[in-house]
Amino acid sequence: MKRKILSLLFTVLMLNVYSQTSLDYKVFEKINEYRVENGLNELIWCKKTFLSVEVHTKYMIVEGRLSHIENSTTPKFTDRLMVFVDNDYILGNENVSMVSINGIEDSIDDIAEKIVDSWKVSKGHNKAMLNKKSNVGAVNCGNSVFTKNNYDFKVVYSTFVLWLDS
C-alpha cells in the first residue's frame, strides 16, 4: 500500500515536469543504432523509465558525483524504477556517466557520441547496453559544472536504464 501511495505521489509530481530533451533522444537513438549493429532489437522508449532516470540524473547533479546508488529511500535503480512502474520484479541494467563537454557543448551529436562511447569502452556498461533480454529503456542527461584544481569543466551527467517489460 505504501508503495502505491508513493508511486501515485511521485507520478503526480513528475507528470508536470516530464521533458525529454533532444540530447536524451539523441543518446537513446545512438544506443539503438549500436544495438542494431550488434544484431539486437531496438529498445522501446518508456516514459515511466524516463521518470526514474530523470530522478537519478538530478540526484547526481545535486550531489556533484557519479554514482549508481543514492542515499535515499530508493537507493538502487530497481527501487527507483518500481516507484513508477507497476512491477514487483525488475530485470535490467543501469548505466551512468559524467563526460566533459568543453569544446563540444554546442553539438548534441558530439555530446551523445561521447556519452555512448564512454559506455562502449567500459566492459560492464557495454554489456548492459547490449543486454539481449531488455526491450524498453530511457535516458536522461543533465548539465553541470565540475571544478578540479581551480578549473571549471562543463559536464553532462547521464543515466540510462534498460529492462525487460514482459
Regions found by a protein language model. Give the residues of each.
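A well-ordered secondary-structure block
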Residues: 76-165
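Short amphipathic alpha-helical segments at helix-loop
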Residues: 16, 41, 104-107
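Sec-dependent N-terminal signal peptides
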Residues: 4-15
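Short, well-ordered surface patches within globular domains
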Residues: 20-82, 132-138, 142
